[in-house]
Design a protein with these regions (language model features):
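Short structured motifs
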Residues: 47-50, 67
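Short, exposed beta-strand/loop patches in secreted or surface proteins that constitute
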Residues: 51-56
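Extracellular receptor-binding modules and their adjoining Ser/Thr/Gly/Asp/Asn-rich linkers
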Residues: 1-33, 58, 62, 66-89
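Extended, low-complexity, turn-rich repeat/linker tracts enriched in Gly/Pro/Ser/Thr and Asp/Glu
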Residues: 44-46, 71-72
């Protein structure tokens, strides 16, 4: 088995105008591995949707998104990749 692997996550978010929303996305971690770091996040390249925070845990990532557009942003696809490392035994 490889020492390092990855898993992907995907969700759709809606954020009211001028609001911040934490979006928690769960991902699967194969047995014997643990989350190491976030490799990338893509928010459909929306220019008015900056990321305010990222918290990664055992099997989920919480991403804080701020809507600066002045209107509700709907159905923005949020995808990313988490790097996993094999646990030492």
């Amino acid at each position: 088995a490889s020492i390092i692997t990855y898993t992907n996550f995907r969700t759709t978010v809606n954020i009211p105008a001028d609001m911040e929303r934490d979006t928690v996305v769960e991902f699967s971690v194969p047995s014997g591995y643990e989350a190491l770091c976030l490799r990338n996040i893509d928010t459909s390249i929306h220019p008015m949707l900056p990321i305010s925070s990222i918290i990664i845990s055992e099997n989920s990532v919480s991403i804080g998104l701020v809507n600066l557009s002045g209107s509700t942003i709907t159905d923005i696809e949020l995808t990313g990749t988490v790097i996993l490392i094999r646990k030492l035994t």
